[in-house]
């Protein structure tokens, strides 16, 4: 017969006879692993043997045939031959390796972070071509623009539409018909007729007068999203822009030349007038711009050094550049994608915390969620079933408390699908609104060349994205509320059974004490930021614009909420991994063990107090790079497919189906295998 033997994080298959003793099997297992892994500091001896199922202790004098069956899984806790110097050297090596990995993460982040970029820098060339047609742009496309991955180009159909609209508009202007913003003033001045010789001056004055924003500028990579989205709206062919000017805008985008755009100053109605005016101002050669070759410089200098021509405005073209909801929508699309990523990873992090806290998976039984068929709830429950203990995906930690008397867990563990689920559903609701807005003509007036009409309307009103982003902030904030409470359970000895603040020498060391305090402060800030911006309205423009959306702040604070949520979940993830140190040699399921290993690449176990912020930041950057999700995705896809074929596959205490997914370090070594790469 054969037994599968776990020693630390390694696994070996050991042949044995029915009349062998447990002691003989344990000795043989240690000898085999020492031969296959000569660098492991294993002693010749071991100190206990346990069955994986139930974590029950085995008597070394028992015969194998009396207590085990063929192919059973056992755990041998072996002694480690390490001097104190070797232990210290190992700790230092882990810290040094983590610092090197943190430096790599910082370097990746700097490549797309230009907030403080005053000097020239080298950027990687774009790897994708994005065709803009005004109808098919997606939020993830804008994020690719933000990362510098895309160059853009107009579709041929869009160019035709733009030409037709411009030809018709120039005809209207030449006939000097009374058309708002073409031959009249703006807002309260809409009753003022402008003489033909001043129509171009009217548009230039509009840009200059409306560029009155306040506050810190958008980072160049985010201003680039704003530019790409405005080009996409102009590509619909209802704005009246000329093909020549839109091609100049595309050339500026592809050269990574972007204007100085203050973040504050829009009320989200009549479009995002202030920020879009700043965007246009730089393209006219006024104000400031940024490019990789110049850093921040006067706009005319930046354009000249990049061989770009400034825009030359004809009738209505100034209004076409600034009348729209693109500031709210571009930031909203970016925030939406980050919310989508953190919501998925929140399911993974919650699963790891539940295993460390020795919670039960029974609350995720498919029948519970089938009779409350919210899509997000069922999706979250499925992920938790796939990540956590089942016969198909075993966790030694879960097996160790199979026979405990606990009936149910606290809400932040038991109700993860119900709370995370509504976040998933809210994100998809917001995605529909934002995607529609990204491909909508939001000018005023709008040019309908086929009808030969120019019609004034209200598509510039930002209520749709404003309300959606307020809703998004409210929903996503719940992820941090749940996470911070799980973090509290992890650091609280009375709730977790783990050492207080997850430190082995409390008193001398404070461990994760203030990590939880920081998380609590961010959750508290989010509660204030979740007050909806869009419930407010202050009339503007002499009461002509008497209801506004306040969407600009809705977008900015939604992004801040998401950033706080990412940070809180990074802290929970670090704490959950620290909790595992006190459960060793037991390990979690294969996908969750992979997350543990990923975190340990930048954050070694906290054996004594040290400066933790670089490690928190590194784990946070991993979350922002979506690496937690990407690490478990192959496992999720396989295990979820198993449940689709067999609804009982991921239930607790079920028969093991085929297709077990295991981390490479957990795959048993065959008798004739001499090494593991």
Swiss-Prot record:
Descriptive protein name: Histidine ammonia-lyase
GO CC field: cytoplasm
Documented EC number(s): 4.3.1.3
Modified residues (2,3-didehydroalanine (Ser)): 270
Keyword NAD: no
Protein's pathway: Amino-acid degradation; L-histidine degradation into L-glutamate; N-formimidoyl-L-glutamate from L-histidine: step 1/3
Mutant lacking the gene: phenotype: Defective histidine metabolism resulting in elevated histidine levels and resistance to nickel and zinc toxicity. Additionally, slightly resistant to copper, slightly sensitive to cobalt and iron and substantially sensitive to manganese.
Entry comment on modification after translation: Contains an active site 4-methylidene-imidazol-5-one (MIO), which is formed autocatalytically by cyclization and dehydration of residues Cys-Ser-Gly.
Superkingdom field: Eukaryota
Organism: Caenorhabditis elegans
Family statement: Belongs to the PAL/histidase family.
Keywords, comma-separated and alphabetical: Histidine metabolism, Lyase
Reaction it catalyzes: L-histidine = trans-urocanate + NH4(+)
């Amino acid at each position: 017969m054969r037994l599968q033997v776990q020693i630390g994080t390694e696994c070996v298959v050991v042949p044995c006879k029915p009349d062998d003793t447990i002691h003989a099997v344990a000795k043989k297992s240690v000898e085999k692993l020492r031969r296959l892994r000569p660098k492991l500091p294993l002693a010749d001896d071991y100190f206990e043997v346990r069955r994986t199922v139930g974590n029950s202790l085995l008597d070394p004098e028992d015969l194998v045939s009396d207590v085990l069956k063929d192919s059973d899984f056992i755990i041998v806790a072996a002694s480690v031959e390490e001097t104190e110097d070797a232990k210290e050297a190992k700790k230092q090596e882990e810290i040094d390796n983590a610092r090197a990995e943190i430096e790599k993460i910082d370097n990746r982040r700097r490549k797309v972070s230009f907030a403080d970029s005053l000097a020239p820098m080298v950027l990687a060339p774009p790897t994708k071509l994005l065709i803009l047609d005004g109808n098919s742009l997606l939020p993830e496309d804008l994020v690719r623009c933000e990362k510098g991955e895309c160059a853009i180009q107009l579709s041929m159909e869009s160019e035709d539409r733009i030409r037709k609209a411009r030809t018709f508009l120039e005809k209207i202007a030449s006939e000097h018909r009374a058309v708002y913003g073409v031959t009249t003033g703006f807002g309260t001045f809409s009753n003022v007729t402008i003489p033909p010789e001043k129509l171009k001056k009217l548009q230039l004055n509009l840009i200059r007068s409306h560029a009155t924003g306040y506050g810190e500028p958008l980072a160049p990579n985010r201003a680039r999203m704003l530019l790409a989205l405005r080009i996409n709206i102009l590509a619909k062919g209802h704005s009246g822009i000329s093909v020549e000017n839109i091609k100049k805008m595309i050339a500026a985008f592809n050269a990574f030349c972007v204007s100085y755009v203050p973040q504050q100053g829009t009320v989200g109605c009549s479009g995002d007038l202030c920020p879009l005016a700043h965007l246009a101002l730089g393209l006219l050669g006024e104000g400031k711009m940024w490019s990789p070759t110049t850093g921040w410089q006067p706009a005319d200098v930046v354009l000249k050094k990049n061989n770009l021509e400034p825009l030359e405005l004809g009738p209505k073209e100034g209004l076409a550049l600034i009348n729209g909801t693109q500031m709210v929508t571009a930031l909203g699309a970016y925030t939406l994608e980050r919310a989508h990523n953190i919501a998925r990873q929140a399911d993974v992090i919650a699963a790891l915390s539940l295993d460390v806290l020795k919670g039960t998976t029974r609350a995720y039984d498919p029948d519970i969620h089938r009779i409350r068929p919210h899509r997000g709830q069922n999706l979250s429950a499925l992920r938790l079933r796939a990540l956590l203990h089942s016969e198909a995906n075993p966790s030694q930690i879960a097996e160790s408390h199979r026979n405990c008397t606990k009936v149910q867990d606290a809400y932040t563990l038991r109700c993860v699908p119900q709370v995370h689920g509504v976040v998933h559903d809210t994100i998809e609701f917001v995605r529909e609104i934002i995607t529609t807005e990204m491909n909508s003509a939001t000018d005023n007036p709008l040019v309908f060349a086929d009808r030969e009409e120019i019609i004034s309307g209200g598509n510039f009103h930002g209520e749709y994205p404003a309300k959606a982003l307020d809703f998004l902030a409210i929903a996503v904030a719940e992820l941090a509320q749940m996470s911070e409470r799980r973090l509290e359970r992890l650091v609280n000895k009375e709730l977790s059974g783990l050492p207080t603040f997850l430190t082995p020498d409390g008193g001398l060391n404070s461990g994760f004490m203030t990590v939880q305090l920081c998380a609590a402060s961010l959750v508290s800030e989010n509660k204030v930021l979740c007050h909806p911006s869009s419930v407010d309205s202050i009339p503007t423009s002499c009461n002509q614009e008497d209801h506004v959306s306040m969407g600009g702040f809705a977008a900015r604070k939604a992004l801040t909420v998401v950033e706080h949520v990412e940070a809180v979940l990074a802290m929970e993830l670090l704490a959950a991994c620290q909790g595992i140190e006190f459960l060793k040699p037991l390990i979690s399921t294969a996908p969750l063990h992979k997350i543990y290993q990923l975190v340990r690449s930048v954050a070694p176990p906290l054996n004594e107090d040290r400066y933790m912020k670089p490690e928190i930041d590194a784990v946070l950057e991993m979350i922002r790079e979506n690496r937690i999700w990407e690490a478990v995705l192959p496992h999720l896809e396989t295990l979820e497919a198993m449940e689709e074929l067999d609804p009982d596959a991921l239930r607790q205490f079920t028969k093991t189906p085929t297709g077990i997914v295991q981390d490479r370090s957990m795959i048993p070594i065959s008798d004739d295998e001499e090494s593991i790469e």
